[in-house]
């Protein structure tokens, strides 16, 4: 399988959203950029902010859509077209209600599971054949509380767990960039 050339963090722009659960995808790519010493640049033609990093000896583009979550696909598909990157060479990092804080999972293909950034990307691509990093944020317990939950800040304990899951995902990312997703999944999904 081809490696990764584009990693997108899904989230909402603006300081009021910066520390929310819904921005777990942004937190992931921001941590990657910080680790690599990369700087973010506004790129209006791609409807977001971009950074270039080197992982496992390969150039990888990072993207934070500035379109708000529900319209993320516009930015994702613009970047894929501009850099001539296939969906299969793309990873979307996003918050995941169905995983507990502290858990991160890699996945390829599938539906959107109610995640609006994935929903819009799938709508514009016409399929879901791209990689995902699902960063667990937990569930509030009842579907009527989901919107407030994802747009709210996690507790200090959950914030630590989410950061730990992001670090764990960063540790296996070189394998995914090189195309060894099965080993990356095995290492990320095996409890320590």
UniProtKB/Swiss-Prot annotation:
**Active site (catalytic residues):** 22
In chain numbering, the residues marked as site (Discriminates between blocked and unblocked aminoacyl-tRNA) are 12
One Gene Ontology term from the biological process aspect of the record: protein quality control for misfolded or incompletely synthesized proteins
Q: Does the keyword Lipid biosynthesis apply?
A: no
User: Which GO cellular component terms, listed alphabetically, does the Swiss-Prot or TrEMBL entry include?
Assistant: cytoplasm
Keyword hit for tRNA-binding: yes
Q: Which reaction does it catalyse?
A: an N-acyl-L-alpha-aminoacyl-tRNA + H2O = an N-acyl-L-amino acid + a tRNA + H(+)
* EC numbers, comma separated: 3.1.1.29
Residues holding tRNA: 17, 68, 70, 116
Q: Which InterPro entries match?
A: Pept_tRNA_hydro, Pept_tRNA_hydro_CS, Pept_tRNA_hydro_sf
Location in or out of the cell:
Cytoplasm
Query: Residue numbers for the site described as Stabilizes the basic form of H active site to accept a proton?
Result: 95
Provide a Gene Ontology MF annotation, just one. peptidyl-tRNA hydrolase activity
Q: Which family does it belong to?
A: Belongs to the PTH family.
Assembly behavior: Monomer.
Q: What PANTHER family does UniProt report for this protein, alphabetically?
A: PEPTIDYL-TRNA HYDROLASE
Function recorded in the entry: Hydrolyzes ribosome-free peptidyl-tRNAs (with 1 or more amino acids incorporated), which drop off the ribosome during protein synthesis, or as a result of ribosome stalling.
Name it: Peptidyl-tRNA hydrolase
Highest lineage ranks of the organism?
Answer: Bacteria, Pseudomonadati, Pseudomonadota, Gammaproteobacteria, Lysobacterales
Q: What's the encoding gene here?
A: pth
């Amino acid at each position: 399988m081809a490696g990764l050339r584009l990693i997108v963090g899904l989230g909402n722009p603006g300081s009021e959203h910066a520390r929310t659960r819904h921005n777990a995808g942004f937190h992931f790519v921001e941590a990657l950029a910080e680790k690599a010493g990369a700087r973010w640049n506004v790129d209006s033609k791609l409807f977001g902010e971009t950074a270039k990093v080197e992982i496992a000896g390969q150039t990888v583009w990072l993207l934070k859509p500035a379109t708000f979550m529900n319209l993320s696909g516009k930015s994702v598909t613009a970047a894929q077209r501009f850099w001539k990157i296939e969906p299969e060479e793309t990873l979307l990092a996003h918050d995941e209600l169905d995983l507990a804080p502290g858990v991160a999972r890699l996945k390829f293909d599938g539906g959107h599971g109610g995640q609006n950034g994935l929903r819009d990307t799938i709508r514009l691509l016409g399929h879901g054949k791209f990689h995902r990093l699902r960063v667990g944020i937990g569930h509030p317990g009842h579907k009527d509380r989901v919107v407030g939950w994802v747009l709210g800040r996690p507790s200090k304990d959950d914030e630590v767990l989410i950061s730990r899951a992001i670090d764990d995902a960063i540790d296996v990312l070189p394998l995914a960039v090189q195309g060894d997703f099965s080993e990356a999944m095995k290492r990320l999904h095996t409890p320590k």
